[in-house]
C-alpha cells in the first residue's frame, strides 16, 4: 500500500521538468555541447548522442549572416534563422545574460548543439539544463507522501535529491515562511 497518487506523481514530474527548463532558459544559452567535430565524424557523433527530454542533437554545418544550417540525427539539414533566435539570451554568469546579436559569435562549424521541435515541427535552440530540482508533495492532514520527484532526469543523474540529499543549513524554517 502506498499514499502516492499516480496523477499527482505525473503532474509533479511534469512540473519539475517544466520548471527546470524555464529556469534554464531564463539564465541563458551556454553554448555548444562539443566543438570542432570533424565533418567525417558528424553522422557517428549524432548517432551516439542520446536525445534527452526531446532535445535532439544537431551539428552546425554552415553559418551565414542570417541563418545557420544544422544536420540532424535523421540526416536531414534544417535551417535556424536569425529571426528564430531573436529572443535567445546568452549566459554570461549565474546572474547575468546578454542579448544575442550575431550568429558568427555564437556558433562555429562542427558545433554539437541541441534543438527542440514544437507542435508545428518548428525548431529552436535547446540545451540540457545545468541544474537539478526535487519535489515532495505531502498530505498535511496525515503526512502521507502524494508525489516524490528526485531530479530532472534519472537517466542523466540517478542521485535522488529527495531521499539522498542533505538539507541546506537554514532550510528548516522555510515551510513556516511559505505557510504564512
PLM regions: where:
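Extended, non-catalytic substrate-recognition/exosite surfaces adjacent to catalytic cores, especially
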Residues: 1-180
Amino acid at each position: 500500500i502506498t499514499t502516492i497518487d499516480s496523477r499527482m506523481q505525473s503532474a509533479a514530474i511534469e512540473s519539475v521538468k517544466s520548471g527546470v527548463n524555464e529556469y534554464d532558459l531564463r539564465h541563458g544559452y551556454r553554448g555548444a555541447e562539443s566543438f570542432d567535430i570533424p565533418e567525417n565524424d558528424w553522422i557517428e557523433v549524432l548517432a551516439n548522442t542520446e536525445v534527452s527530454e526531446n532535445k535532439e542533437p544537431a551539428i552546425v554545418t554552415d553559418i551565414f549572416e542570417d541563418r545557420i544550417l544544422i544536420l540532424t540525427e535523421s540526416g536531414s539539414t534544417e535551417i535556424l534563422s536569425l529571426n528564430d533566435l531573436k529572443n535567445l539570451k546568452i549566459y554570461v554568469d549565474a546572474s547575468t545574460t546578454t542579448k544575442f546579436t550575431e550568429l558568427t559569435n555564437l556558433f562555429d562549424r562542427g558545433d554539437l548543439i541541441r534543438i527542440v521541435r514544437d507542435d508545428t515541427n518548428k525548431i529552436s535552440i535547446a540545451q540540457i539544463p545545468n541544474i537539478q530540482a526535487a519535489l515532495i508533495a505531502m498530505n498535511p492532514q496525515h503526512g502521507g507522501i502524494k508525489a516524490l520527484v528526485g531530479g530532472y532526469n534519472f537517466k542523466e543523474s540517478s542521485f535522488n535529491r529527495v531521499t539522498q540529499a542533505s538539507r541546506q543549513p537554514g532550510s528548516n524554517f522555510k515551510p513556516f515562511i511559505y505557510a504564512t
